[in-house]
């Protein structure tokens, strides 16, 4: 099954003829926000990920890294299937970096959900050359749910869109921080 997923991944990423061998590429694929920006090629954009136990919310930035928009919610089945869909969308939308929501506890510690997000990123980097960064996603789903409630969105519609909107919320936070960093640069 892993070989089948690897073949699909190699086919969906342009200019990728084989997956990286060994562990030399590990840890180098996880970047700071600034490094992720520097690694971006012209015309590429970022994809935000909100990792849940049952779903993965996805969002896209525009090519100017100004605005994040909800894209899709993947219903999780197994890692290889989930990543194959993720990388298919990454190739389609010319993704140059992933912004992965890191669910840090309110006191700043990392619990099981944050460890799960880090494990997902480690496994993803074994299959993809696309760099990633983490973004503190504390309260992102709660903020989106509150916004949807304020907009009088039905329960069914909220359930349908909350994950991809949370991914957009996460990505937008990272984009705004990037702008802040760039504004302070000499």
What role is predicted for each listed range?
Residues 22-49, 54, 59-186:
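Phosphate- and other anionic-substrate recognition elements at nucleic-acid/protein interfaces
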